[in-house]
């Protein structure tokens, strides 16, 4: 399952695509604050 911001989780593990995650942090910071961290994806 893809949760947005570069985070992918399976039944037994989760992984982070750090390139995507770091690229999205700045883009989503304000939106995350406004939505309780549900922005992006």
From Swiss-Prot:
InterPro entries tied to this protein: Bacteriocin_IIa_dom_sf (IPR023388)
Keywords assigned: Antibiotic, Antimicrobial, Bacteriocin, Secreted
Secreted listed as a keyword: yes
Listed GO biological process terms: defense response to bacterium; killing of cells of another organism
Chief location: secreted
The keyword Transport belongs to this UniProt entry's keyword annotation: no
This protein's GO CC annotations: extracellular region
Protein location: Secreted
Function, as annotated: This heat stable bacteriocin shows activity against species of Lactobacillus, Listeria monocytogenes, Pediococcus, Enterococcus, Leuconostoc and Lactococcus.
Family: Belongs to the bacteriocin class IIA/YGNGV family.
Name of this chain's protein: Bacteriocin bavaricin-A
Record lineage: Bacteria, Bacillati, Bacillota, Bacilli, Lactobacillales
């Amino acid at each position: 399952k893809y949760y947005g911001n570069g985070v992918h989780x399976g039944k037994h593990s989760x992984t982070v695509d750090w390139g995507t995650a770091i690229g999205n942090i700045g883009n989503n910071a304000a939106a995350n604050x406004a939505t309780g961290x549900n922005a992006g994806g």
